[in-house]
């Protein structure tokens, strides 16, 4: 759900 989208967002922001 939303948590998946957030996970990707955090990954992209961290990269």
From Swiss-Prot:
General function of this protein: Has a strong specific activity toward 1-chloro-2,4-dinitrobenzene and ethacrynic acid.
Assigned EC number: 2.5.1.18
Sorted UniProt keywords: Transferase
Binding-site list for glutathione: 7
Secretion signal span: none
Homology family: Belongs to the GST superfamily. Sigma family.
Protein name per its UniProtKB record: Glutathione S-transferase
A molecular function (GO) term: glutathione transferase activity
Biological processes, Gene Ontology terms: glutathione metabolic process
Record field: catalytic activity: RX + glutathione = an S-substituted glutathione + a halide anion + H(+)
pH dependence: Optimum pH is 8.5 with 1-chloro-2,4-dinitrobenzene as substrate.
Assembly, per entry: Homodimer.
Source domain of life: Eukaryota
Gene source species: Asaphis dichotoma
């Amino acid at each position: 759900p939303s948590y998946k989208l957030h996970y990707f967002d955090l990954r992209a922001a961290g990269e």
